[in-house]
């Protein structure tokens, strides 16, 4: 197994205090934030559930600022998300805007830096970490808060550069330490989770094929 299961992510998110706001894990058909007056968040896969999943993203809705946050651990642009994963979220944003604001307008803020290594399978866990930041600091979840300050972002264009690998490896180590402090579920299943989400997991899978 590689990556994180929906059950694991839901358990960790609950441990991190996101339960009252968490709409669950979804595939690419996530309908959006339809109760527009409530703080809400979700973890969304870029693929259909029938495929087994490809890559996890996190979304948060702050009704006070009418802002939708999209966190991608790789920090890909809209164009690259569509190119690599065939993932489009415009329809979700339109549904959210219709439901959430009188003037049908909202702001989108998305991550632009890479915090995850190119062969890491920890995207779901990074999404859990972001949602902890979102529910505790909903006006500044991307950075400038104690949770996300544990990670160091690098420009997305350097994702495949050997010179940033030590930084991205440290990020994954910080991620595991953070979850070990805050999630009893992670502590109970740490060895299995770290094996399935290892920093070089995708490389391991390529070699074994």
Swiss-Prot record:
The active site is at 55, 72, 123. Induction: Expressed in the late phase of the viral replicative cycle. The record marks 52-53 as: Cleavage. One of its GO terms (molecular function) is DNA binding. Keywords: Autocatalytic cleavage, Disulfide bond, DNA-binding, Host nucleus, Hydrolase, Late protein, Protease, Thiol protease, Virion. It is found in: Virion; Host nucleus. Pfam families: Peptidase_C5 (PF00770). It comes from the Viruses. GO terms for biological process: proteolysis. GO terms for cellular component: host cell nucleus; virion component. Requires DNA and protease cofactor for maximal activation. Inside nascent virions, becomes partially activated by binding to the viral DNA, allowing it to cleave the cofactor that binds to the protease and fully activates it. Actin, like the viral protease cofactor, seems to act as a cofactor in the cleavage of cytokeratin 18 and of actin itself. It catalyses: Cleaves proteins of the adenovirus and its host cell at two consensus sites: -Yaa-Xaa-Gly-Gly-|-Xaa- and -Yaa-Xaa-Gly-Xaa-|-Gly- (in which Yaa is Met, Ile or Leu, and Xaa is any amino acid). Its EC number is 3.4.22.39. SUPFAM superfamilies: Cysteine proteinases. InterPro entries: Papain-like_cys_pep_sf, Peptidase_C5. The keyword Hydrolase applies. Belongs to the peptidase C5 family. Cleaves viral precursor proteins (pTP, pIIIa, pVI, pVII, pVIII, and pX) inside newly assembled particles giving rise to mature virions. Protease complexed to its cofactor slides along the viral DNA to specifically locate and cleave the viral precursors. Mature virions have a weakened organization compared to the unmature virions, thereby facilitating subsequent uncoating. Without maturation, the particle lacks infectivity and is unable to uncoat. Late in adenovirus infection, in the cytoplasm, may participate in the cytoskeleton destruction. Cleaves host cell cytoskeletal keratins K7 and K18. Interacts with protease cofactor pVI-C; this interaction is necessary for protease activation. All late proteins expressed from the major late promoter are produced by alternative splicing and alternative polyadenylation of the same gene giving rise to non-overlapping ORFs. A leader sequence is present in the N-terminus of all these mRNAs and is recognized by the viral shutoff protein to provide expression although conventional translation via ribosome scanning from the cap has been shut off in the host cell. This is Protease. It comes from Human adenovirus D serotype 9 (HAdV-9). The lineage of its organism: Viruses, Varidnaviria, Bamfordvirae, Preplasmiviricota, Tectiliviricetes. The gene is L3.
């Amino acid at each position: 197994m590689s990556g994180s299961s929906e059950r694991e992510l839901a358990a960790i998110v609950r441990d991190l205090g996101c339960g009252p706001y968490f709409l669950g894990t979804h595939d690419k058909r996530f309908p959006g934030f339809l109760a527009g007056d409530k703080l809400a968040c979700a973890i969304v896969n870029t693929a259909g559930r029938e495929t087994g999943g490809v890559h996890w993203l996190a979304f948060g809705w702050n009704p006070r600022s009418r802002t939708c946050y999209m966190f991608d651990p790789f920090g890909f642009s809209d164009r690259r998300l569509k190119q690599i994963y065939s993932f489009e979220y415009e329809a979700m944003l339109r549904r959210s805007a219709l439901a959430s604001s009188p003037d049908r307008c909202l702001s989108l803020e998305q991550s632009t830096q890479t915090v995850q290594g190119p062969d890491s399978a920890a995207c779901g866990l990074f999404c859990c970490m972001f949602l902890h930041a979102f529910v505790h600091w909903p006006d500044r979840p991307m950075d400038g808060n104690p949770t996300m300050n544990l990670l160091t972002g690098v420009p997305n264009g350097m994702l495949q550069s050997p010179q940033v690998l030590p930084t991205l490896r440290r990020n994954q180590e910080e991620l595991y330490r953070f979850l070990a402090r805050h999630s009893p579920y992670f502590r109970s299943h740490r060895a299995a989770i770290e094996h399935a989400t290892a920093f070089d997991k995708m490389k391991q899978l390529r070699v074994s094929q």
